[in-house]
Structure formats: C-alpha cells, structure tokens
Amino acid sequence: MKNLHFGAGNIGRGFIGELLNKSGYHITFVDINKDVVNDLKRRDTYTIRILDENIEEVELNNFDALNIAEEKEQLYTAISEVELITTSIGPNVLPIIAKDIAEGLKLKVENNNTKLLDIITCENMISGSEFLKTEVFKHLSEQEQEFVNKYVGFPNSAVDRIVPAQKHDDVLLVEVEKFCEWVIEADKIKVESNRNIEQVHYVEDLNPFIERKLFTVNTGHATLSYIANYLGIELVSDGAKHADVRKDFIAVLEETSALLEKKWGFDKAEMEAYRNKTIKRFENPRIVDNISRICRTPIRKLGYNERFIKPIREAEELGLSNSALLKACSYILTFKSEEDEQSVQLE
C-alpha cells in the first residue's frame, strides 16, 4: 500500500506518518523544505519521541520524499498511482497544492487508471477534504471530474494530537503526546484497505466528533490559558494544576459536555471519561506549551462559530447553563500582548 503525504512537518511525521507506518503503508512525504526533504531521502529511519510518564521512542522506516517545487513529474506520477493521499499542511495551503493534485489526477485519467484512490485532509478545519475537492475540481474538465467522482474518494476527517513547538539538532526528530485521535467518514472511502488504518475511528457522521473536540479540547485549552494568563502563570501544565484555574475551566467543560450530550446524544459517562482524559493531557509536564501561544488571536477565538460563542449560543437555545462559558469570555478580554495584533485591537 502506498501513501503520498503532503506536509513533512511535525504533524505529518509525528502523527499521520506514525499511524500509516504502523498500518503497513509506504509513505512518500511531499514538502518544500529542502533540509527536511533531503534528510528524509538520505536516511532510512527517523525518531518519534512520545512524551508520556515514561518517554518512549519509536523508529519509523519505509518512507521517501519529494520536493514539491523541484520534482513535479515524479509527484504527478505518484498521485496517479497511490491508494491514499493525505495532508497536514494547514487549511490556507490546500488551494495551493490543489493544482498539483489536479495535474496528477489528469495523468490518472489520461492513463485510464481505474485503481481506486482516497484523498483525506488532516487539518484543523471542518469538511477539509470536501474543500480540497472543490479546489481540485477548479482545474479539471467536466469529463475529468466525472472520472474522479467515480474512482476517487474525498472522506472528511478530524485529527487531535498535541505536538508542541520544538527545535532539535536532528531535524527529523519529533516529540508528541501519547494521545492521538483520527476520525474518518466511513461512507466516502473508496479503497477497502483505507478502512483498516490502525487507531483510526471510522464513523458515518463526523460532525459530533468535530464538535466534541472543538468544545472540549479547544474550548478547554483556551479557557485554561486565558485564566492562567490573568493569574501570571506561564505554562499550560502549571495552569492545569492550579486550583483557581481548574475550578473555572472544569466548570466550562461540564457545560460543554452537557451541551454535547443533549445535542448529539453522547453518553454521560463517555463524556466524563473524554473530559477527564483531556484534563490529564493538559497536565502533562513533559509538554512544554506556553500560555501566551495559546492566548494569541483572541478575536478569532471569539468568532460566531468558534469555541466560545457557538457553545454559548447553542446552550442558550437548548435551555442549558452557559454562565461558566460567559465568565471565560471575560478573561479573554484581559489578555494583553503587544506582539499579538488582535490583542492590541481589543484594547
């Protein structure tokens, strides 16, 4: 089984690459960073360091790499031949790679290669694969689109793993937390073997899982950080263990859990376990994550469909408590940083 993965950064190598490697895929990483690409070409293995109570190191092999700027023909050939294409490049970059993917799919059509293919984005966005499909189709004729619709799937997915900011002498070494979650829409998958990726959760409806992550991990992370920042705490792990911070951010998670249970039918015990696991992740002292980094872009985080305002609105509509969420928003307004443009705009 062959995989082409756009993005040889920490998420690509330390999350998606790990799960695909465990599942027996040969991975070709695609990136524009010459140092990373050249190292991946030169070496047979790289290391993932899992930051848990006991540090574990995993060696990955069975990979190669392509430079997206310099190896176009090899890239297009690979796109036309592999069974799985994945991405972890950031939502803003998807339209940029869409033309390259389209060129590879044109070659697939030209060769009448009816081998099935799935293209799955692993980005922090809703309906990322559908978005990429729309961008790719801008570069295809109606006949080519018809062929792609028949033989290429674009299942949406949701991903969750904390990969802290890091720098190492070994450019390929990547440190990650132990927890990871990759959820994929089952009904849009074309290739049967892509239904058997290790540790992936396959579902019919992705929306409940996207909102569970958004309203628990993202809302909780941000709430903890804004309160901790107000109290002068610098690290997420320290904030997660501070009594005053815990009181308020756990109250927020209890409100979002109640909303998720009522809206999507999540089991109460299941939500409590997910909530407690999330809190434990934030407490991990081996993940060195600065509060100031999480607090950036406060205006975006106060967006209508974002991690605070959306659960506040929906809790109100369903007659549920949202007082802890409203209190959390007041802490956002106390964040001051001359280095953050949105923080300055809030003053």
Language model features with spans:
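Substrate/ligand-engaging "lid" and interaction regions
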Residues: 1-6, 10-347
